[in-house]
A protein has these predicted regions:
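Acidic/aromatic-lined carbohydrate-recognition and catalytic surfaces
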Residues: 2-162
Length: 162
């Protein structure tokens, strides 16, 4: 099956473009362990930016970043508490903007690991939802009823106690 498609350019000539999401070389980065730029032992956005030439030299088309959003880090960054903030140890929104600009300068793309199927228990939606069954955020979550007189069952693949 041919994974290329043809588009017509503004000049009227046909352009053949790669179907980027099918044919691209994707380089996944777990920011925490990739490259530390400030000596604190934690990888960060500026560290990733500093290695873009190397990544590009590998023939990479897309960089896929694991979660970088604000998180209490109980679930390796997948427990996001604010989708509008960068995890402080990774840098700032300005660092992210610079990283994105530098990626685009090298004609690469960026894919973010956007975790929308669950949040941190510290996320404002969850904090509101747990207040009442009538709260507007209550149905954002799936709630499991507790046995009478028992705490709710809490399942976690990462927590040995729960």
């Amino acid at each position: 099956m041919d994974s290329k498609h043809v588009t017509e350019s503004t000049s009227g000539q046909e352009d053949i473009q790669k179907t980027w999401w099918k044919e691209a070389i994707i380089y996944q980065i777990y920011p925490r362990s990739f490259q530390d730029s400030d000596g604190d032992g934690i990888g960060d956005l500026n560290g990733i930016t500093s290695r873009l030439d190397y990544i590009q030299s590998l023939g990479v088309d897309i960089i896929w970043l694991n979660p970088i959003f604000l998180s209490p880090n109980d679930d390796n960054g997948y427990d996001i508490s604010d989708y509008r903030e960068i995890m402080r140890e990774f840098g700032t929104m300005e660092d992210f903007d610079r990283l994105l600009k530098e990626i685009h300068k090298r004609e690469m793309r960026l894919v973010l690991d956007l975790v929308v199927n669950h949040t941190s228990d510290e996320h404002p939606w969850f904090e509101e939802a747990r207040k009442s069954r009538h709260n507007p955020y209550y149905n954002y979550y799936h709630w499991w009823p507790a046995e009478k007189g028992e705490p709710p069952l809490r399942l976690s693949y990462f927590d040995e106690e729960g």
